A protein has these predicted regions:
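Metal-dependent polysaccharide deacetylase catalytic core of the NodB/CE4 family, i.e.
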Residues: 114-116, 197-198, 342-470, 493, ...
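A glycine-rich, often tryptophan-bearing local segment used as a flexible ligand/cofactor-contacting loop or short
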Residues: 165, 169-236
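Aromatic-Pro/Gly-enriched surface loop or interdomain linker
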Residues: 73-159, 309, 336-339, 345
Length: 593
């Protein structure tokens, strides 16, 4: 592998300017080794604590720049994990039949949730996306059913422990039976955003009964929402508007408040009895430490109110492959072990540089079984309590840029993504990816390479770059016990229509769920430590991770999950782990979440 430092410089230049390039941190150059196989390792004695590793100095001007860059939410063009992608449609698809989602096995409450969503108009496809996300969250507590609100029939609501209605289409024609049942319900109801005025108009005693009256949308810039005495973030350029109120008083309770730029406030979420109203859609412009976490916590009130508060944390070592530096991996693993921190680690089984991008134009193909030192490092990490995770067979695709270099670790393996002028475009499935057999073939090749390296198939998978097609996700559900990642969802999944890959949307979850693809999904709430820009994700330093972990405390049974690449200074890992411990988080194994 050639000139890896320039690889990092290439990423930094996406920040914009030569100043950023000065911050390149040294990285170890590794080569394919041809040594005889090592004998099995004996059990290791407990390791003494490692001395603290001093931080690697970074130019102060650049460090200040990075802090400013991450002090507020940075919009990422064409990033489906920030906001659903795609414009209006000329003809909305048919509403579709109800979708039944499986609850997370072993969930404490085994409640049932009815998710109702909008479908009409050119933006009707958003309703299905938001319903998918709401259903995923509800699966933490039990089974769920999603259906278009226009298909609602009288009495349906009372068959469930709770109902979530997501008003994403202004003026959706809500059935009178739905409005009547909501007003008469003893079931917990969470109403999100639009069309609340249809309920108030249908029930003249609404204000007297509930103690509040929605008024107009307030479009003031709001960057902060307060909840449980904690401030969480909101993308202030989101000008869709948040509902304000003409009156509010007993018996209503303000659960969360928006903070305008002039420090004045107004309600973000209100509850009265069994009825909770949220004045905007939390799934749009979602990021780490976001007001989306408030909804995630409010679901406990509706579905599992006796849940005890606990705050757990996960850490995983990211993007390990046959040419990773074994010394750096073991340094991180030994420090975690010596401090009693369980961890996971990603393994990509085969390193490919098909065009010699980092090797003077000479192609490289390095399978794991040819690297005895890396094999020994992996076995040692397992002895130290590390949990291996699948992270792609090659973590790249063919010999084309997808989207960058065609090299393992840089590119996507299960989805076509292009890059132009620093903007990523999520194109869709790869040409061969027509059904689940293609992804299953990649999984089988991965398992064969691990077997040749004396390892068994991991129980947990993370798709490279958090990107895959619907058949790929479905294949993963049949192959792995869980996925640990953020996930792409598409119109057509709930409605059993043709999948619309032009409108992807991403979601992270703060607790384990059983998602719409049928997989258990582990939390990935904080992203990773990375002083660079890569895949158009802004730099994130330990202070950023810790700040968002503090915001994540608003979820009473939430998990703070982050990843660390051993190519970066060990001090980054140490600072972040200690910061989460100081906040009261307890680190657990990925197998125990």
């Amino acid at each position: 592998m050639k000139d890896i430092e320039s690889k990092r410089r290439r990423k930094l230049l996406l920040l914009g300017g030569a100043l950023a390039a000065q911050a390149c941190l040294p990285m170890r150059v590794t080569r394919a080794l041809t040594l005889p196989p090592l004998p099995p390792l004996p059990p290791l004695p407990p390791l003494p604590p490692l001395p603290p590793v001093p931080p690697v100095p970074i130019l102060p001007p650049l460090l200040d720049l990075l802090k400013r860059f991450t002090a507020s939410i940075v919009p990422v063009p064409n990033n489906p994990y920030f906001v659903p992608q795609g414009g209006p449609v000329a003809v909305p698809p048919p509403a579709g039949a109800p979708f039944s989602g499986t609850g997370l096995p072993g969930s404490a409450s085994q409640s049932s949730t009815l998710v109702l969503y909008d479908t009409t108009g050119p933006w009707g496809w958003l309703g299905e996306i938001y319903a998918t996300m709401a259903g995923n969250l509800a699966s933490h507590f039990g089974a769920w059913v999603a259906m278009p609100v226009v298909s609602y029939t009288a009495g349906t609501l009372q068959q469930y422990s709770a109902c979530i209605y997501i008003g994403s289409t202004y003026g959706e024609p809500l059935p009178a039976a739905f409005l009547t049942d909501v007003y008469a319900a003893t079931t917990n109801v969470i109403w999100i955003y639009d069309n609340i005025w249809q309920l108030t108009a249908s029930q003249p005693q609404f204000a007297a009964r509930y103690g509040f009256m929605p008024w107009v949308f307030d479009t003031s810039p709001v960057a902060t929402v307060t909840y449980k005495s904690q401030s969480v973030r909101r993308y202030s350029a989101n000008a869709a508007g948040i509902m304000s109120y003409s009156s509010i008083g007993a018996p209503a309770t303000v659960l969360a408040e928006c903070v305008r730029a002039d420090s004045t406030t107004f309600p973000w979420a209100v509850r009265s009895g069994n009825f909770t109203y949220i004045g905007e859609i939390p799934f749009a412009y979602m990021t780490e430490g976001d007001r989306y976490l408030i909804l995630c916590d409010l679901l406990f009130d509706a579905l599992a109110p006796t849940t005890a508060t606990q705050h757990r944390a996960l850490v995983r070592l990211e993007d390990l492959h046959p040419l990773s530096d074994p010394t750096a991996l073991l340094q991180a693993a030994e420090w975690l072990f010596s401090n009693g921190i369980p961890f996971g680690f990603h393994i990509t089984a085969r390193y490919l540089d098909p065009n010699g991008y980092y090797n003077d134009g000479v192609p490289q193909d390095v399978p794991l079984h040819t690297q005895p030192l890396m094999i020994a490092a992996i076995r040692t990490m397992q002895l130290l309590g590390g949990v291996m995770m699948h992270h792609g067979y090659t973590h790249q695709y063919s010999n084309i840029a997808n989207p960058y270099t065609a090299v393992t670790g840089d590119d996507c393996e299960f989805y076509r993504i292009t890059a132009s002028n620093g903007v990523l475009t999520y194109v869709g499935p790869l040409p061969e990816d027509t059904d689940s057999s293609w992804a299953q073939g990649r999984f089988d090749s991965y398992a064969a390479e691990l077997s040749a390296s004396t390892f068994t198939m991991p129980q947990i998978s993370t798709f490279p770059a958090y990107s895959a097609s619907v058949p790929d996700y479905q294949a993963a559900a049949q192959t792995f016990a869980a996925r640990a990642e953020r996930t792409l969802y598409f119109p057509g999944v709930l409605t059993n229509q043709t999948i619309d890959y032009t409108r992807p949307a991403g979601q992270y979850v703060p607790y384990s769920v059983q998602d719409a693809y049928g997989s258990k999904v582990l939390p990935d709430t904080l992203g990773g430590i990375d002083p660079d820009v890569f895949f158009n994700i802004p730099p994130r330093l330990p202070a950023d991770i810790i700040a968002d972990a503090q915001r994540t405390l608003v979820v009473r049974d939430g998990v703070a999950s982050f990843f660390y690449n051993p190519e970066d200074p060990l001090s980054y890992l140490q600072q972040t782990v200690q910061g989460l411990l100081d906040l009261g988080y307890q680190f657990v194994s990925p197998l125990d979440v």
